[in-house]
Amino acid sequence: MPAQTTNLFLLEDLEDVGRTSELAERDLHALHAVANWIRTYVVKPHQDLGRAGPVCPFVPEALERKTLWLAPEQIADRDVPDVVELINGYQRLFLDAQPTDGDDASYKVIVVVFTDLSAERAQGVFDDVLQHLAVPSYVEDGIVFGPFYEGHEGTAIYNSSFRPFQSPVPFLFVRHGVTGDWKFFLDDEDWLNLWARRFGESAVHALAEELRRLPWRVGRD
């Protein structure tokens, strides 16, 4: 568990009045909305996903290991530098959180839920914040951020008509980058280069494993 837990909640913590009694009603409602969305959508298969398995294969394992935390924040009146500093704080908290090594550490994720941010403003706020944080956080600490909000136009890897990044409340997740992230970087050469430098030989193996699954290889085996 992270050393600082007052503002971090496992999904099951939301049912504990003792843990949530000091939360503003807006914050508690937003956390419940995201938690329900995770339980009913993110960890389930979807017919439009284009592959088997849950919408996000990472999340069921994180829930099982109790390494996924929700954190409510109100930022409507804050400017971009303030939000950048806020997320920097969560990044430091994430890096210090137990576990810090082993398999469990690979499944840590903090979901920062912006409880008073409208969907209309979310894209602009996230774009501005990530312009400051995304590259240095990845290069220095291997951290990736994932923005979700209603109206997000990002599409699924295996189905360009399916938009899985649309959440009921805007949030930004913080997690370790993994070798499988290359699929999200294929259309961005700069990010693909950063990924290759970070993972080195493991990156080559990840691509080779994917190539082995292609039809031309299957036909030879």
Language-model-detected regions and their locations in the chain:
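Expand to "…catalyze enediolate/carbanion chemistry for C-C bond making/breaking, isomerization
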Residues: P2-D221
